[in-house]
Amino acid sequence: MAGPLWRAAAFIQRHRTSLLVGSCAGLFGVQISFHLFPDPIVQWLYQYWPQGQPAPLSPHLWSLFQEVLKDIGVPSGHCYKPFTAFTFQPVSAGFPRLPAGAVVGIPAIFLGGPVTNIEHSVIIHGQRVDWQSPAGTRLRDALTMSHNAQKFALAKEVVYLESGVAALQTLPAPACLAGTWAISVGAKHALGLYGGPMSLRTAFNLVAIVVGYVAYTFSKDSLTLALEGWLDRRTASLSAAYVQGGVEFYEKILSGNLALRSLLGRQGEKLYTPSGNIVPRHWFRINHLPYTTRRDSLQQMWRATVSPGRF
């Protein structure tokens, strides 16, 4: 056992710079590939398939999307490929400035019919939704959004794609890996651990890995929270209608989550908080800005728009 371990350690020691560069490039490449080649991966994952056939993009959704592009002022040379998605919120990926372009999944619920029809059966987390129940009625109302709310939801995705922040979100992983390696190597040289027993260096490396992972989660989550807040403010700054639509959009999400919390019973209590926010998967991480925080931020913008003299 000692022989292979020593050979592996010696190999890593000789080629550590090449391994570091390759690992950082691999982390960056894996994350960015989803945006470099969004079609047909994203559409395959989120395409709406009613009655076993992919739903074409309706003229209404196409018109809505074009209206949003016009409001934002997207150049005609930027490539967008919208499609009908089964999700409750829009999804997107890609870089519109590149030849592969960007794809945007527009929820089928924006049409109203697939959800507002009580005869249409919907299964969420393995349970069929009872549209006649109070929670089912509340969910159906939450999924029915106004024109302004739909525009805000779509515009937020377009702003995300136009700003290119997807590339920024891929940086924490390789940056933290390189930083952890550089600091750990420097610390081991300073402490003279390279002249000591291998077990001591192994223990130090394990501690460095834990510290590096904590730094990665903190930087990634902090960046995500900052970007989500910026996207909301940037989208709402388009006009007062977008501010109003943003407030309604997050109100609808919170209301829908509360309805799902009731419909799903004990499982719903594990997924959603009593306020309608999503329960974090890990107790030490906040992966996304709470919906209540995003709604309250836009409500402040709306009050400032309605009564500018008071602020």
UniProtKB/Swiss-Prot annotation:
It is a multi-pass membrane protein. The keyword Lipoprotein does not apply. Keywords: Membrane, Mitochondrion, Mitochondrion inner membrane, Transmembrane, Transmembrane helix. Residues 1-17, 186-190 are mitochondrial matrix. It is found in: Mitochondrion inner membrane. Residues 39-164, 212-311 are mitochondrial intermembrane. The chain crosses the membrane at residues 18-38, 165-185, 191-211. One of its GO terms (cellular component) is mitochondrial inner membrane. Found in a complex with COX20, COA6, MT-CO2/COX2, COX18, SCO1 and SCO2. Interacts with COX20. Interacts with COX1, MT-CO2/COX2, SCO1 and SCO2 in a COX20-dependent manner. This is Transmembrane protein 177. The lineage of its organism: Eukaryota, Metazoa, Chordata, Craniata, Vertebrata.
